[in-house]
Swiss-Prot record:
Expression by tissue: Expressed predominantly in the cerebral cortex of the brain but also at low levels in the spinal cord and medulla. Also expressed in some astrocytic brain tumors such as astrocytomas, oligodendrogliomas, glioblastomas, gangliogliomas and primitive neuroectodermal tumors.
Effect caused by changing L74S: In XLID111; likely pathogenic; severely decreased surface expression; severely decreased localization to dendrites; loss-of-function variant unable to rescue defects of excitatory synapse development and synaptic transmission when expressed in SLITRK2 knockout-out mouse hippocampal neurons; no effect on interaction with NTRK2
Principal location: membrane
Gene (name only): SLITRK2
Protein name: SLIT and NTRK-like protein 2
All ranges on the Cytoplasmic side of the membrane: 643-845
Signal peptide feature range: 1-21
Length: 845
């Protein structure tokens, strides 16, 4: 009962706390800030509220949210300033006049993914500036006064992918500044960079997808060779890198220069001549040169438009240079009055390059709100506004645009023909919006478009022929959307070199009509998709493996079925992916036809099978030989053990005569039939030991107490039982039989051992035979052994033996014995010495 009451009280308190939390969050949204829920994320808009510290704001504790603090008075961020903001995923601190961020200011923001510090007065990024932001993926710090970055400033931001540092005062980058981050986008435009080394900087951004280096005073000398070499090896979007110095390369694009242009090999004879010629040019130009040619930045407190009057590329025809001199080379167009929309910042490189209009985060809801219209805009940045629809007439007066940035808005609708007038547009950013469907008329008029960014939308469908009008399209980012499939021939009319399909919902991707339409040497990112590694993915596997150049940026990782989850597609065998299908090695193989002027086409051609190589790899050969050797050793060892066991299975007689047990032997009769055995050195015939104990009931084997000699003297007869008589007796499990046979004296004298030498060859078949069973006894161990001389003296007197053996079957003839000793009892009793001599002689046989 008490436990139930306790449980109810706990639930009540939890409910009250949750209600209070909701009430507090509601009060914040109602009184201090404007709150709006979008995509299950709460947007807390606290812009221009005059906050001097964020400790005055109490955020909700049980919901994730985006916090907008733009346009406040947060000039300094103190330690633990955001300790209560653990559920914030996005934090906007732009236009606050922020000058200092102290150590631990961002502690508590463990889930923060995007941080915006743009349009402030920061001068340095220290190693401890971003402590606590382990989950940060997007950092925007453009339009500040940043002139120095410490080497470990980004070392804790292991998940950082996008870094925006454009329009600052950076002279150089410290070594290993990007060592611990995996950047995909880096913006360094509008700084004061002259060189960029490979060691310590470029070597750590190998996974970069976009790097912008425009509007820097690049020093195109031998020091720029590492950057030039790096640019020649990548295919990512870089932007225009224009030389500022030396004089001879002023205004040239670095990507169009050769190594000889950057670092010429001058001989001693003409080096002085070229030097004096260059000095003459400089002296002639100096009186008339506009100071604006030297890129400088006005004090950023007032933030006036940045003027970078970069000269137009000079004429390369030597005749013109000699006729008109350098004044003609650097002559620019007549000044044109520049107009800039209110609430925007406009900069210009030169009158012929147009105007850069920066209207980021100005709360515009429509593009038509930009008044007055800018004059000849070259680049228009409308990032981070509240645009929801791009109307058909919004961009009619922006035909000179080269770049249009509409990212991070709320655009869900683009009316048909909205971009028709943008015939010169090369870069279009539509990332971070709410687009769901792409259709062909959406991109009408963009025949010059080269770079299209559509990542981080909610795109679920792309209509056929959507990109057909984009004949110059080179880069297409569709990552982080909801795509499950692509229509046939979707990329047929493009010239793509970079395609990003990362983090969508693709389980399969057909080759025919999709991948086979991609041009040569394309880089494609297919990672973070739920790939289903079954038979349907074999086309994609073949396409990736038969490509002539490495086109896959990241590996294709299987998500299903469960047995292949987490495995890389290219490491899976065909049988593992599709075990029930026929052998695919004899099936369809993708053939690739390359042409320098035409896109690569992947076609299915039965006659264009790849050449089959029958050579066995060395590693496989060595492994096979090793297996054969091991099997041979095992087989030989088994055969040896088998033979050894067979040999041990043959019975043998011990060689030690003192420990010999009588086993079996055969006695030669006049007529006999018996089994044969090989004679050994320790055969039983060498000697017959005295009997040991009473082993059977036959009297002849019964040893009586007292003198054993008297026993032999009283022995009256030998017992013999014929087969016929045995038949009359009742059957018993065992019975005893003894036999005595006198050995006839040999016709010729010979050794006793020769008696049984060829006994195996003298087998004769008896006329009739009967089956007789024998039970024998083991004789006692003899107490002494006579000498050899004694045995020799009594050898001729041996005339009988006693047969002992193990139980065995044999055939005994029923013929009547002829020896007188077998017909009656002995005529006389044996003498003791005679018995002893006989026993001694027999024991030596």
């Amino acid at each position: 009962m008490l436990s139930g009451v306790w449980f109810l009280s706990v639930l009540t308190v939890a409910g009250i706390l949750q209600t209070e939390s909701r009430k507090t969050a509601k009060d914040i949204c109602k009184i201090r800030c404007l709150c709006e829920e979008k995509e299950n994320v709460l947007n807390i808009n606290c812009e221009n509220k005059g906050f001097t510290t964020v400790s005055l704001l109490q955020p909700p504790q049980y919901r994730i949210y985006q916090l907008f603090l733009n346009g406040n008075l947060l000039t300094r961020l103190y330690p633990n300033e955001f300790v209560n903001y653990s559920n914030a995923v996005t934090l906007h601190l732009g236009n606050n006049g922020l000058q200092e961020i102290r150590t631990g200011a961002f502690s508590g923001l463990k889930t923060l993914k995007r941080l915006h510090l743009n349009n402030n007065k920061l001068e340095i990024l220290r190693e401890d500036t971003f402590l606590g932001l382990e989950s940060l993926e997007y950092l925007q710090a453009d339009y500040n006064y940043i002139s120095a970055i410490e080497a470990g400033a980004f070392s804790k931001l292991n998940k950082l992918k996008v870094l925006i540092l454009n329009d600052n005062l950076l002279l150089s980058l410290p070594s290993n500044v990007f060592r611990f981050v995996l950047l995909t986008h880096l913006d360094l435009r509008g700084n004061r960079l002259k060189v960029m080394p490979f060691a310590g900087v470029l070597e750590h951004i190998g996974g970069i997808m976009e790097i912008q280096l425009e509007e820097n005073p690049w020093n195109c000398t031998c020091d720029l060779l590492p950057l030039k070499a790096w640019l020649d090896t990548i295919t990512v979007f870089v932007g225009e890198i224009v030389c500022e110095t030396p004089f001879r390369l002023h205004g040239k694009d670095v990507t169009q220069l050769t190594r000889q242009d950057l670092c010429p090999r001058k001989s001693a004879s003409d080096s002085s001549q070229r030097g004096s010629h260059a000095d003459t040019h400089v002296q002639r130009l100096s009186p008339t040169m506009n100071p604006a040619l030297n890129p400088t930045r006005a004090p950023k407190a007032s933030r006036p438009p940045k003027m970078r009057n970069r000269p137009t590329p000079r004429v390369t025809v030597s005749k013109d240079r000699q006729s008109f001199g350098p004044i003609m080379v650097y002559q620019t167009k007549s000044p044109v009055p520049l107009t800039c929309p209110s609430s925007c910042v406009c900069t210009s490189q030169s009158s012929d390059n147009g105007l850069n209009v920066n209207c980021q985060e100005r709360k515009f809801t429509n593009i038509s709100d930009l008044q007055p219209k800018p004059t000849s805009p070259k680049k228009l940045y409308l990032t981070g506004n509240y645009l929801q629809t791009v109307y058909k007439n919004d961009l009619l007066e922006y035909s000179s645009l080269d770049l249009l940035h509409l990212g991070n808005n709320r655009i869900a609708v683009i009316q048909e023909g909205a971009f028709t007038n943008l015939t010169s547009l090369r870069r279009l950013y539509l990332n971070g919006n709410y687009l769901e469907v792409l259709y062909p008329s959406m991109f009408d008029g963009l025949q010059s478009l080269q770079y299209l960014y559509l990542e981080y939308n909610v795109i679920k469908e792309i209509k056929p022929l959507t990109f057909d009008a984009l004949i110059n399209l080179q880069l297409l980012f569709l990552n982080n959307n909801l795509l499950r499939s692509l229509p046939d021939n979707i990329f047929g009319g493009t010239a793509l070199t970079r395609l990003n399909l990362r983090n969508n919902h693709f389980s399969h991707l057909p080759v025919k009509g999709v991948l086979d339409q991609l041009p040569a040497f394309i880089q494609i990112d297919l990672q973070e998709n739920p790939w289903d590694c079954t038979c349907d993915i074999m086309g994609l596997k073949d396409w990736t493996e038969h490509a002539n150049s490495p086109v896959i940026i990241n590996e294709v990782t299987c998500e299903s079925p469960a047995k292949h989850a987490g495995e890389i597609l290219k490491f899976l065998g065909r049988e593992a992916i599709c075990p029930d299908s026929p052998n695919l090695s004899d099936g369809t193989v993708l053939s690739m036809n390359h042409n320098t002027d035409t896109p690569r086409s992947l076609s299915v051609s039965p006659s264009s099978y790849p050449e089959l190589h029958t050579e066995v790899p060395l590693s496989v050969l060595i492994l096979g030989l090793l297996v054969v050797f091991i099997l041979s050793v095992c087989f030989g060892a088994g055969l040896f053990v088998f033979v050894l066991k067979r040999r041990k299975g043959v019975p043998s007689v011990p060689r030690n005569t003192n420990n010999l047990d009588v086993s079996s032997f055969q006695l030669q009769y006049g007529s006999y039939n018996t089994e044969t055995h090989d004679k050994t050195d320790g055969h039983v015939y060498n000697y017959i030991p005295p009997p040991v104990g009473q082993m059977c009931q036959n009297p002849i084997y019964m040893q009586k107490e007292g003198d054993p000699v008297a026993y032999y003297r009283n022995l009256q007869e030998f017992s013999y039982s014929n087969l016929e008589e045995k038949k009359e007796e009742p059957a018993t499990p065992a019975y005893t039989i003894s036999a005595t046979e006198l050995l006839e004296k040999q016709a010729t004298p010979r050794e006793p051992e020769l008696l049984y030498q060829n006994i195996a060859e003298r087998v004769k078949e008896l006329p009739s035979a009967g089956l007789v069973h024998y039970n024998f006894c083991t004789l006692p161990k003899r107490q002494f052994a006579p000498s050899y001389e004694s045995r020799r003296q009594n050898q001729d007197r041996i005339n009988k033996t006693v047969l002992y053996g193990t139980p065995r079957k044999c055939f005994v003839g029923q013929s009547k014995p002829n020896h007188p000793l077998l017909q009656a009892k002995p005529q006389s009793e044996p003498d003791y010495l005679e018995v002893l001599e006989k026993q001694t002689a027999i024991s030596q046989l």
